[in-house]
């Protein structure tokens, strides 16, 4: 078979496979070059007798993620709802508090005002940021030069609000608040639909999973493309100096095409040599954007014992000593293979990597026993984990984050073509970037950029809106009148201060009128 094709796709994750499928469906010849011995990229479904199947990488889908839902349905996949029937748990200062809804409730009135102001402020700031061009926000540079830690120090007045906000950042982007740009993080949350949508299970980003695992999306596209998908072919050189693009792999194979789609995380572009060299901004961008740190952990039990205690399996866990910050029930929809999924996030992933797998499991079980107040948590029947930080062809998970100052300086070139190279990957999406949904959007957009380049579609068809999924409809995210209008803590203090001044002035005036002042 000839190594010549119309398009070479570098990277066989969901983004690259979605791009390849669209081009293949349009009659173009495509070759996918994947470095690993499997497709799927940052999605990874393993199968064995202890788990049946389990997603060790990207897994969750939900309402408003219409592209991945449409593609998966076309490939014959179905979703099921992540269990949230029973109560959730918020574990803080050594105690467990049951709750329902997306956010743990707050009983202290000052903390309540502070929490309410935090979520409201982040959403309001997000509204100022264009999803497709965050560097065009009115205060882009001011916000980009600030870390999320600095922003939270400005917004939050109470320690408990700052702690839950820090957990929120850690969970959303697997990085520390001092590591990420405020502009980038606020954009990230905004393009996922806001603070409530991104964090929620029901009606949110974690509502559903695929029966059989998310790895099937890439695997089924591979079945369609057949031997056009080449595994264990790390790309080491892309040469655009001739009429066609020449792509060389680590095992000394040479492929030739009219166009290339790079569907790998931006930082992995550092593993490839380019002729001619990349333009300055692209060349520097790829050395400045790391990926987050996370170990995904699945603890299996004989049965979902937490449900008997009226807990759904979702735990929001605060505290430096806790290895896991967030869990979800990962039991199969028929109740078999009972499991709790937990994330070891950011600096904790870097700290706990020093332990053995068995030591990490013990720490997790001891934590779950404490939070759930159950000795059954100490009796796991199986354990799976995946440390994405050690994956040389990912560099981390879930996604690339932008440190302060990078987005405004380099963001414009994120998906800007370089000659005949077009860029996909979830990082280049404008909606649910960082998720499987963003991967599909980016892959299909890059494919349509090539269709436009060869004259098959007009430019205004490169970006296409996606109809809402009929199977997974989205309910609007609403807020109450009080949530919208309650003052912040400093607002309340100002109000008290003003009230005090007005009261004192009024009393003084009355006293003066009635001659109550003592005259010296």
Swiss-Prot record:
Similarity section: Belongs to the flavin monoamine oxidase family.
Keyword check for Zinc: no
PANTHER family found in the cross-reference section: AMINE OXIDASE, AMINE OXIDASE [FLAVIN-CONTAINING] B
Membrane-side (Cytoplasmic) residue stretches: 2-489
Names of required cofactors: FAD
The protein's Enzyme Commission number: 1.4.3.21, 1.4.3.4
Subunit relationships: Monomer, homo- or heterodimer (containing two subunits of similar size). Each subunit contains a covalently bound flavin. Enzymatically active as monomer.
Organism field: Mus musculus
Gene that encodes it: Maob
Name used for this protein in its record: Amine oxidase [flavin-containing] B
Transmembrane stretches, start-end: 490-516
Role description: Catalyzes the oxidative deamination of primary and some secondary amines such as neurotransmitters, and exogenous amines including the tertiary amine, neurotoxin 1-methyl-4-phenyl-1,2,3,6-tetrahydropyridine (MPTP), with concomitant reduction of oxygen to hydrogen peroxide and participates in the metabolism of neuroactive and vasoactive amines in the central nervous system and peripheral tissues. Preferentially degrades benzylamine and phenylethylamine.
Residue numbers carrying S-8alpha-FAD cysteine: 397
Localization: Mitochondrion outer membrane
Modification N-acetylserine, positions: 2
GO cellular component: mitochondrial inner membrane; mitochondrial outer membrane; mitochondrion
